[in-house]
Structures are given as structure tokens and as C-alpha cells.
Amino acid sequence: MKNIRNFSIIAHIDHGKSTLADRFIQYCGGLDLREMSTQVLDSMDIEKERGITIKAQTAALNYKARDGQVYQLNLIDTPGHVDFSYEVSRSLSACEGALLVVDASQGVEAQTVANCYTAIDLGVEVVPVLNKIDLPAADPERVEQEIEDIIGIDAVGAVQCSAKSGIGVEDVLEEIVAKIPAPTGDENAPLQAVIVDSWFDNYVGVVMLIRVKNGTIKLKDKVRFMSTKAETQVEQLGVFTPKSVQKQELKAGEVGFLITGVKELGQAKVGDTVTLVANPATEPLPGFQEVQSQVFAGLYPVESHDYEALRDALEKLQLNDASLKFEPEVSQALGFGFRCGFLGLLHLEIVQERLEREFDMDLITTAPTVIYEVVLKSGEKIEVENPSKLPDIGSIETILEPIITATILVPQEYVGNVMTLCNQKRGVQVNMQYMGRQVMLTYDLPMNEVVMDFFDKLKSTSRGYASLDYHFKEFQPSDLIKLDIMVNGEKVDALSLIVHRQSAVHRGRELASKMRELIPRQMFDIAVQAAIGSQIIARENVKALRKNVLAKCYGGDITRKKKLLEKQKAGKRRMKQVGNVEIPQSAFLAILQVSDK
């Protein structure tokens, strides 16, 4: 056991985490050159394209160190994006150490800081590594100083490497052996193994990635999941080198995969503890949480007969992504669809893209919303995540909205812009700290302002230099109202929004004018109105297309022309009574782009 090292890599998006992992695998001979694809551990196409890691993957590598001993290095790959922070904390809790990989030209970013604090809280040894030192812009001294100023760990003489060209990779491996402690645990104690990740395989069902903390797990053992109490039998055990290699048993300190008869991902929850039925552990390992959805959106098929196909597709995605929640929903404007819950906006985009790419679906997505707590005058408390489900204004005592604490790291020259943006979004400044060239701003922001377009605006106002990390803080009472959009006097439920009273009128006007551009002109006038309750706050008209009925009249009496124009008017009026308006997909997307300027 003393020769095992379990570690993961913490890094911001694009700081070279997956490339470094590839180099480790190549160096330790886990795959031969023919099998090396770039980013071996990122197995979903979308992970490679966006350059982000979503699911945790592992590799068990044998490394012959300079002291002549062979060490087993278990690399657990972690996601770096803020939406997947729970997965990160699970991956980290399975390790004794973490490599903090920082781009030597860019320096420290907010998500790195957040994940690093998570690691330190979990008592994991953090080893700083400077990557991309072969770039002309690399400035190792400045970045070492930044790591010390911002994160507060000693970074003098941090290992320098370039994962792309392979310089210094061996030094990093030596550093892992030297600095990261060996796992502790008792092979003979009752089994406690934490599920780091789980995914669905078409042939064997659910594959779980486990880290054995105490005890030993063998083939054919009966095991129990402690949070769901489900029991099942071990059918396969093994490790990934990243190819899967079967083993007879896994002992304390090891990381490997476990396949049982479980067919549903919901039973093998990430962070849960596995124990033996015959000799169970008294209590589970700490840190397990049920995943909470933060952002909700409606997904509707463009063709209504694709409804069942969409249900199948969502169920298949759910097999691999336990944090995706969905339930059927009916909208008057869009027909049958699903209300889905996501971890954050990136998660929403990824799910949408996977549905379109892997399952060939054509979708309409409504504007993302968050959960509100509504206290009724009767004293009852309800949760509302869909604006069209908000009860009548008269029966509401207060509406509480979720507030998040956002940590923003930004270079000094952009601080003013970022603070202005946060104030526009009704943010309250909590803290501001200067660290070298960077400034760390802490704000309490309403979540519904963040889901709209905060991230894009933050990037554009800081020329891409600001980075953001956020976590939920609490529900706070707020002056919120429901904004309805009416087309031709009829409410379109899918376009309703919950907004703050201050920005309602402005938001309504902007939406109405945007809708006017997007709704195709019909044979009759269409009125687009924004309303709060029964009060109309904005109106735009989509002008009718009309034929020139006077084209055939040359000269002659004015009454003839009047008669033709009146006849045309009467026809348009009749049309308007029976006509209905198709609202294009672009109009639903417009809501997302309407900004609070």
C-alpha cells in the first residue's frame, strides 16, 4: 500500500489538464502509440470539442521511479467547470493529493482557486505545477508569486513542465511520488468504498468508479449501497490503465471499477458508500449530497410526434448523467414537452447539444429560470420554477429568490467595468481584495440575473480575462413580478418571465420590440404586448402585408378607390378574428438575448 499514490489534477479550463494526463499515460506505457488519441480521458466528443472534462475518468499507471521502486499512480481526472463542482469534490475526496496545474502565461483563475480551496478543506495535499513553460509569454516567477498571494500555498520552486512538448513530465511524476502521501486504511476492516463516478454501459449496465477506503472487495461479494439500501452482487472488478483490466479483488487504497447487476444510474449515486452485506460498515463516508438542480428550462420537440423520441433520448442521457432531472409538461403555445433541471447553464447547453447531436432531435428551448420560494397569504410555502405556474398576484405574500455568492477574479484594469456590471445585476458587494495584478471581488447576486447572460457579459466587459465561480447562499425576499407577453391578445405561456419590478417596464419594452422584429408579418396586424397582471406596459404592432388594391384604378372617381380600400380593410378585420400566429423558435431565443442595458 505504501507504493500507491492517488491523485487528481486541478486546473482551469484550457490550462492543459487533459494533455498532461495524456503524457502521464504515454510515459508510464499505459497505451502504445497506436492507441494514443489526444485527450484519452475525455471520451465524449463534446468534451474534446469544447475542451472541457465533464465526467471523472481514471487511469492506474505503473511508474518506475528514480529510486528504483515501482509505484502505482492512480490518476482521477476531475472536471474543471463551475457547474460540475460536486463531481470535483467527489473526485478530490478519493485522493490524497492533487496537482494544481497553472498555465505559466495566464496565471491563477477563479475556478482553480475554488477547486483548490475544496481540496484544502478536504485535507488533500496540493502540489503546484506550472504548465506551458515553453510559451513565449510564460512568466513562471510572477505566477509562483500569484499562487502564493491568492491561494496561500508555498509555490517556490514549483515543478515546471510543458505537457504539449513533454518537457519536465518526469519531474512532475517524481514530485507526485515525493510529495503526495500514500493512502491510509485497513484492508481487514469492514468495507467502505466511495463511488467517485458512475456511467452506463450498453453491455454490462452501470459501471462504478470506486476508491476503496477500508476493507477489501472481491468478485461475487454481495454489496449494499448505503444511501439507497439497494443490494447487489459484484460481477466484475478491475482497473483502467486507461484500458480496462480485470482483477480478482480491490484492497484499501486502490481505485478501480465495479460492475454489479445494477441497471439504473439512480441507484449508484456519486458520493455514496459501498459496503458488504455480510460485514457492513457502521456508517457511510462523509460528504454525500443529493444533487440539486439550479437552473430549469422547458425542452419541446419542434414536431409534436417526436415527443416519445425526446423522452427516450432524455432517459438515455439520464443514464449517464444523474444530475439531469426532467418531468413532462404541457404548454399552450408549444404543446407537449419536458421541464428539465440542470446544474447550471453550461450543463443545459451540453444536454441540448447532445440531444441534437447524438439523437438528432429538433428542439425548442424556453428561457432558463431558477427556483423561487413563494409564501402565500394563507401562510403556505410553495416552490415555483416555471413562471407560468406562479399563483395569482393577489394571493402572494412574498416571493423569495435564490441568491448566490460569486467570486470573480479580474485584472485591475477591468475592475470598474465588472463592478458596474454587478451593480446593474442588483449585486451587493461583499468583499474586494487586491492580490498582485489581480483583484478578487466577492458579490452576492440574484441567481436569476446570472442565468440570463451574466457570464457572456462578464467575459466581454473584461475582454475575456475575468473568471467566475459561484455557489448558492440563501433565499431572500425580493420585489418580483410576473411579466407576460401577449400576441394578438392571447398570453403565450412559454414567454412568461419573473423579473424584478425595477427592470420590468424596460424589459417589457425591449422584449416587445424584439418580438416585433421576429414574428413574421401576416395578412393582418398583430399586436405584441407586454403586461404585468392586467396592466399593459408596452405594445408593438407587426404591420400587415397588404396588396395594392388600387393598382388597377387609373384616374376615375375617388369613391371607387375608397370602396376598394374599405373592402380590403373589412377582409383584414375578418382575418384577424380567425387568424392565429405561429411564433418562430428565434422568438423564444430572443428572450435570452434581451439584456438589461
UniProtKB/Swiss-Prot annotation:
Q: Does the keyword Ribonucleoprotein apply?
A: no
Reactions accelerated catalytically = GTP + H2O = GDP + phosphate + H(+)
Q: What class of enzyme is it?
A: hydrolase
Primary location recorded for the protein, binned into one broad class? membrane
The record's keywords, sorted A to Z, are:
Cell inner membrane, Cell membrane, GTP-binding, Hydrolase, Membrane, Nucleotide-binding, Protein biosynthesis
InterPro entries, per the entry: EF-4, EFG_III/V, EFG_V-like, EFTu-like_2, G_TR_CS, LepA_C_sf, LepA_CTD, LepA_IV
Q: Which residues bind GTP?
A: 14-19, 131-134
All copies of domain tr-type G, residue ranges: 2-184
Q: Might you name a Gene Ontology BP term for this protein?
A: positive regulation of translation
Q: According to its record, what are the GO cellular component terms? A: plasma membrane
The annotated topology with respect to the bilayer is: Peripheral membrane protein
* E.C. no: 3.6.5.n1
What function does the entry list? Required for accurate and efficient protein synthesis under certain stress conditions. May act as a fidelity factor of the translation reaction, by catalyzing a one-codon backward translocation of tRNAs on improperly translocated ribosomes. Back-translocation proceeds from a post-translocation (POST) complex to a pre-translocation (PRE) complex, thus giving elongation factor G a second chance to translocate the tRNAs correctly. Binds to ribosomes in a GTP-dependent manner.
Q: Under which name does UniProt file this protein?
A: Elongation factor 4
Species of the source? Neisseria meningitidis serogroup B (strain ATCC BAA-335 / MC58)
